[in-house]
Regions:
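A charged, aromatic-enriched C-terminal amphipathic alpha-helix characteristic of glycosyltransferases
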Residues: 14, 336-369
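Short His-centered aromatic/hydrophobic patch
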Residues: 87-95, 112
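Short hydrophobic beta-strand element within catalytic cores of glycosyltransferases
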Residues: 35-36, 296-300, 305
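A short, active-site helix/loop in glycosyltransferases that binds the activated sugar's phosphate group
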Residues: 138-177
């Protein structure tokens, strides 16, 4: 079997990490390739090449997406050796599906990793998504989504309800297992005292992730003379805004922004409470990693139920006043780490092996039709 994954980029991020790990897992079962719709080299490419995965590039899409269809079709016509094209391009999956089938690719699997954003409410975007759904319904052979909400958003509730499958994003659970030694080492490296209360977060620094709420909470806790520290693991276009906010709140000495990181486990070890106040999430892989580390978590009501596995995940509505968030953080602090996190997640089928085996089963079902 030959499988080609189609992605926008392979830089560090939840979707990209999922595809990278899936490629590495499936490469032991079949021939795998990855088509990146961007000519720039991505963060994960070297790791994929080491695993024997073929990497291809085409130019990034323009605003009209016409060049995307033309470039995809030209690529697929010269790579008909692939049995299945698996697309991870959100709404643009419709264009990928049509280009693949028009070029003679036998089977197409579409994968949804996200839910509606504020800009998706515009009439032009709604019409665009309607067209993309029609293309996917006509050309795709299987619909996968990381959550029910993600499936309903991309494919439409009726279509996804009839033929779609929810495959929660899995992780290598043991990779995130908590270590006292790593905690002490990382906290020392970051300059944290044993008495410091560290609120942490991992993810891209952007408006959707809503990290400014974490800083607001830290500012209030600081006024209460709580020795709070904030650890933001990631990089993004909001970094300077967040640094300015920290300065305005007079907590700049208590906030660390690490920038992009290839591994997050040691940083999770250093945290006391994990916050994930996103305005929108298709799944929330970072939250699952924090749960695997045993961290008590405070999350927004926009997080999908599929990823809220442990009882130590506390959900607060974004419409609630900030005092409700502070109370949740204080409750999480009292809860402490879960000592059975790894075993519970494995039992609930949240391992990457369980996830990728489900995808492998879907591939075989698609080829048998």
């Amino acid at each position: 079997m030959r499988i080609l994954q189609v992605v926008r980029t392979m830089n560090i991020g939840g979707l990209e990490n999922f595809v990278k790990n899936m490629l590495q897992y499936l490469s032991e079962k079949c021939d795998c390739g990855c088509l990146i719709c961007d000519e720039k080299k991505s963060d994960h490419e070297d790791d994929l090449v080491k695993a024997g995965i073929k990497i291809y590039h085409i130019p990034e899409p323009d605003k009209t997406k016409i060049n995307l269809y033309n470039n995809l079709q030209a690529f697929f016509e010269t790579h008909r050796e692939y049995d299945i094209v698996h697309c991870h391009m959100a709404g643009t999956n419709g264009i990928v599906s049509k280009a693949a089938k028009d070029a003679g690719i036998n089977k197409v699997v579409c994968h949804s990793h996200g839910v509606a954003l504020q800009q998706d409410e515009a009439l032009s975007m709604k019409l665009y998504m309607l067209c993309m759904r029609k293309l996917m319904q006509r050309h795709a052979d299987a619909f996968i989504a990381c959550s029910k909400a993600a499936g309903n958003y991309l494919y439409g509730q009726e279509s996804f309800g009839e033929v779609g499958k929810v495959v929660p994003n899995g992780i290598e659970i043991n990779r995130y297992r908590y270590s006292d030694d790593e905690r002490n080492s990382c906290r020392e490296e970051l300059g944290f005292k044993e008495s410091d209360f560290v609120i942490g977060h991992t993810g891209s620094l952007n408006s959707v992730k809503n990290q400014e709420l974490i800083l607001d909470i830290a500012g209030i806790l600081k006024e209460k003379r709580i020795p709070v520290k904030v650890l933001l693991v990631g990089g993004g276009n909001r970094e300077q805004d967040l640094k300015k906010q920290a300065k305005d709140l007079k907590i700049e000495e208590d906030v660390i922004i690490t920038g992009k990181q290839m591994g997050v486990t040691k940083f999770l070890d250093a945290m006391d409470v994990f916050m994930f106040p996103s305005r929108s999430e298709g799944f929330g892989l970072s939250l699952l990693e924090a749960e695997a580390n045993g961290l008590p978590c405070v999350v927004s009501d926009k997080i999908q139920p599929e990823v809220k596995v442990l009882n130590s995940v506390l959900s607060v509505s974004l419409n609630e006043p900030i005092q409700c968030w502070i109370e949740a953080v204080e409750k999480a602090k009292v809860l402490g780490r879960s000592k059975m996190a790894n075993e519970i997640l494995d039992e609930k089928g949240m391992s990457e092996a369980a996830c990728y085996e489900t995808v492998w089963k879907i591939y075989n079902e698609v080829l048998s039709k």
